[in-house]
């Protein structure tokens, strides 16, 4: 009897609990508004879902949560739930909660749900005591009722057709063409002015219709075709970035001092040409002479027309030699540095004295070119040799000769050291070595271009007395007269050109005194296989005076023997 009565009592309580769950305000979870609560929060008397029941157990202090379908309730618990419920709990625990000002958390994030429950139950942020809960609830109800009444007092907007019915006559507006008032016309004019800047004004118009005419200033905006109408601007900017205009400039625009009408060019036939013809051959390497040396004469700034005529004569005489020998083209080197004794050929690196041009360059005969294949190189000695007195580049005198690097005085002694006079070897003229200069011809000497001794230097800048194909190892040469590079001929007379001064900063010492290792002299092999006297120094780094005169024509061709 007692068990059945107890069972009947539990069934009765369960039925009452299910009836309370079916109430409208209890159909959702009190904490997260999820439909179908399955647990009951016996601490506050609310109905919650499964996820919120776990969060409520983790609060401090933990809430007592019971399952609706898996537990039994006593009579006191049922009465407690009947007195509370979600509606009453909302008035107590969320009495001060404002839906518009307070942020509702995202209940899908468990961390945010836990923080919201702590604010609600632990901190009692929106808590209202039960005795004041009904008063606060009534105030909220009155406020919400007044707002609802104000909202309902606003008439509902309905279409005109629903008010007039289907039988309402059609209303036609602007059927005629009444005259417009001045106010309307002015407003339309203002609208047309604003229409140009209104991006949304043409949305309702026909996209295929012809556009309205615009003003001239607007039509010409960003119209690049109108740039051609400015004649003055085009004429001013016609030559902008036009590199062809540089070809019409004067001789000063020729970069690097390329020859113009007043300068001697690389080819004699272009001497009298215009600047345009010279620019046409610019970077055309076929127009350069077949020579391995650079044309320093083109950098001259005070070259006279007499030099140009001399160049033309030399090129005319070279026509026969070019057919006779393949190296005849090297004869143009004579046109660079020589134009006669005391010539007016200027230098780009200094000021030269002016004197009338003397004799014309003498060209070797055709017989010498035919007898020796290297005879065409005869004019190479005219670059570095002279029949007149040797001159120094930096010693001022009354008469001036030509020089490449500065003022060239004539007739002055190049060095204060003594120089011995004697016949030049192989009939060669006095030396034009830019590193060794002397007042007169001397006997045979070493061909080292860097050696400074007391003998008159006869070696040219690049070894005038050496052979073109040196026979320094005892091989007899096949030619009779050794010259600067090759060939057998008599060197023509030209003014000496000493380009660099003699260095006298170090005292000259006897042979072998400066370095003990190189103190011994070595036998010098002559171009004809003969050993010269022991007094000739063959060390290129020693400075000393010879012990005696050497036989004519006995000079070393190997600077390291």
Swiss-Prot record:
SMART domains: ArfGap. The modification Phosphoserine is found at residues 167, 181, 362. Residues 170-193, 413-433 are annotated as: Disordered. GO terms for molecular function: DNA binding; GTPase activator activity; zinc ion binding. The modification Phosphothreonine is found at residue 177. Expressed in the testes (at protein level). O-glycosylated. Residues 11-135 form the Arf-GAP domain. InterPro entries: Arf-GAP_FG-repeat_protein, ARFGAP/RecO, ArfGAP_dom, ArfGAP_dom_sf. Disruption phenotype: Mice have a normal life-span and show no apparent abnormalities. Females display normal fertility but males are infertile due to a lack of acrosome in their spermatozoa. One of its GO terms (biological process) is intermediate filament organization. Keywords: Cytoplasmic vesicle, Developmental protein, Differentiation, DNA-binding, Glycoprotein, Metal-binding, Nucleus, Phosphoprotein, Repeat, Spermatogenesis, Transport, Zinc, Zinc-finger. GO terms for cellular component: cell projection; cytoplasmic vesicle; neuronal cell body; nucleus. Glycans are attached at residue 367. It comes from the Eukaryota. Signal peptide: none annotated. A zinc finger (C4-type) spans 29-52. Residues 176-191 have a biased composition (Polar residues). It is found in: Nucleus; Cytoplasmic vesicle. Contains FG repeats. Required for vesicle docking or fusion during acrosome biogenesis. May play a role in RNA trafficking or localization. PANTHER family: ARF-GAP DOMAIN AND FG REPEAT-CONTAINING PROTEIN 1, DRONGO, ISOFORM F. Interacts with FCHO1. Interacts with EPS15R and EPS15. This is Arf-GAP domain and FG repeat-containing protein 1. It comes from Mus musculus (Mouse).
